[in-house]
Amino acid sequence: MQTQSPFGPLLGISSSLLPSPVTVAAAAAAANGHQGPVSLTTFPSAFAAFASQIRNNQLQSLLQSQIQALNGGMGSPGNGPGTPLSRNNYAHHHQQHQNQQHVGKIRGTTEYPLRKRVGGSTVKTAKVWRYFDELPTIEQAAECRICRKKIKATNSSTTGMIRHLRSCHVQEYQLVQEARQNSMIVKMEEKARAKLLREMNEKVITNGIENTPIVKKESQTESQKSPSASSSASDTASSASSSHFSTNPLIGLPAPVAIKPPAPPTPSNSILNLSQSQNQCQNQNPMFQSQNIKNEPTDVEEEDLEQKRSRDILHRPSDLGTKMFFSSPRTFNLTSAFSSITPLEDHKFQKKIEDDHKIHMQIALMLLLDQQPCQIIDRPGIRSLFKFVLPEYHMPSGDVFQATIVPQLLNQMKQQIEALVHNSSSLSSIPDQVMTSSSATSSYEDVSVNESQMAGPNVGDEEEEIMEEEVEEDENVEIEDDTSSASSSIDTDTCDAMASFIHFIGNDAFPHDELISLLSVVTNLFTYFSTRPHVQTHLQMTIIQPTSQPLVQQVQFVTSNLSIISDYIRQTPDMQLLPLAVNQEAMLEKLVDHIDQLV
């Protein structure tokens, strides 16, 4: 029995055409000159037997034919005759068979290579990139232009750079936020403009379709009424319809025409008005070829007014896409609505600026009332609190508060107090020290120095000199600067009352500067509540009877109602009121004890 080759079924070759390993071995032995019995044991393995069969020319031709048949059955254009059968061919055929249901290119092939995302090849449109330079590295990082710190950044994510500006460069962060808001407003305006233009175009198309039968009906009616004018009427109607549905080369939409139902005039008048209105509009603006078909004849003055109005509207500088619609009265309301989009956005932006300014002033007032440094604004706890309570509010840094916002608040308070002093004739004047402690501004320190010289050991001799200085300051108040004018606004009675009170308690009993500041705040509080008796009644405040020393009454009033006054200021903050500081409250208690000993 002849031994069959084990690789015949794999190659698809019939057993009759494929020689057995014994025959191949015998042939190989005969070729080598060896004689002997041939068997399968001659070869060390089945693969060696198959390899010996490949050397046969007949087998090689059969293999070539089988390979060509396989390539033809697979249908791959890249495998032609003579292409060797390899593992890649089968793998490619298997992959193609599996991906037949997918549409498109296959990832990982030469037609659709795998992309390796590396930043730097696209245009940077984000506003934050003006403060960063992109590093040409695979890590996708950016370098800050201010502090040269490397920040992780990609083309689609700028969160890291924005956080870096918010935490390290507050002013630049505010500029970026303003630029982003402006760009957002511009985009909203563009979207609104495009939407409005789309609606106007749709309405124009609808109006044109609705008005088409009117022109035809008018032409038919005129042709029936006047046989002699039928040819001219049909020509006019056809020209009107062709000009009405003429496509605008700029936008690609038909030009609008306001056509009203015809009234019962004579056929000759209607045809005349139709041709006149058409020629008039074509002479005014031949590009757009828009017209208004009037049904009744009008006077010469009304026609001139209508021509002037349409000419002004057409020559008004505006968008080319909307200029063609201004001649139609049906679209005039839409154009007015379009013009009101920009003021509405400006109003919202202006309102946000005003709200932010109010919050700035309230924070500055909190710093003044609590006597806290401006650096407290930079603490992460306060910033996170404001970020949670007011997400849209961008808090400036502590340096901005100290350099700009707090001085602005002090100037505003100074103006209000000066207006209160000048406008209230029945009120006792308030000195400038009501606004500040010893560290507010240098102008108030100068006033304190002048008043400290006033309360020296010889009070009686220096009172006359102080009176002369006040008279000179009142005479030169118009030519002095802000500091000297503020000093001259001090009332003479108030100065006399302070000098008399200091002489009463003793010139060296308390530090002069701190005492002047305390008396200024006490005078302000007493004046505020004494002019508001309904507030005193509502708060059930203790009333102090007048004494020989006015400041003694004021000091006793503030001391008796100190807790009520503090609660009132805390609940209803007012720019005209400044609360007592902690050291001033302690000094007030000592002053009251000292007055009780003297009395």
UniProtKB/Swiss-Prot annotation:
Coiled-coil region list: none
Main localization (coarse): nucleus
What tissue expression does the UniProt record report for this protein? Expressed in neuronal cell bodies in the ventral cord and HSN neurons.
**What is one Gene Ontology biological process annotated in the Swiss-Prot or TrEMBL record?**
molting cycle, collagen and cuticulin-based cuticle
SMART domains recorded: ZnF_BED
Q: Where is the composition biased (Low complexity)?
A: 223-246, 268-283
Q: Provide the protein's localization.
A: Nucleus
User: Which parts of the sequence are BED-type zinc fingers?
Assistant: 123-176
A Pfam match is zf-BED
Q: Ranges of Acidic residues compositional bias? A: 460-483
Which residue stretches does the UniProt record annotate as biased composition, category Gly residues?
A: 72-81
Task: Output the superkingdom of the source species.
Answer: Eukaryota
* Recorded phenotype for the gene knockout or disruption: RNAi-mediated knockdown results in an egg-laying defect and vulval cell-lineage defects including failed division of vulval precursor cell descendents. RNAi-mediated knockdown causes a decrease in expression of lin-39 at the larval L3 stage. Knockdown in L1 stage larvae, in a lin-39 mutant background, causes abnormal fusion of vulval precursor cells at larval stage L2.
What's in the GO CC field?
Answer: nucleus
Sorted UniProt keywords = Developmental protein, Metal-binding, Nucleus, Transcription, Transcription regulation, Zinc, Zinc-finger
InterPro entries recorded for this chain? Znf_BED, ZnF_BED_domain_contain, Znf_C2H2_sf
List the SUPFAM superfamilies hit by this protein, alphabetically: beta-beta-alpha zinc fingers
Q: Provide the GO MF annotations for this entry.
A: RNA polymerase II transcription regulatory region sequence-specific DNA binding; zinc ion binding
Region listing for Disordered, in residue ranges: 70-104, 208-283, 440-491
Q: Where does Zn(2+) bind?
A: C144, C147, H164, H169
**What does this protein do, in the record's words?**
Probable transcription factor. Involved in vulval organogenesis. During vulval development, may play a role in the regulation of cell cycle regulators such as cul-1. Positively modulates expression of homeobox protein lin-39, perhaps by binding to regulatory regions of the lin-39 gene, acting in the vulval lineage. Plays a role in larval molting.
PANTHER family reported for this sequence:
ZINC FINGER BED DOMAIN-CONTAINING PROTEIN 39, ZINC FINGER BED DOMAIN-CONTAINING PROTEIN 4
Q: What is this protein called?
A: Zinc finger BED domain-containing protein 3
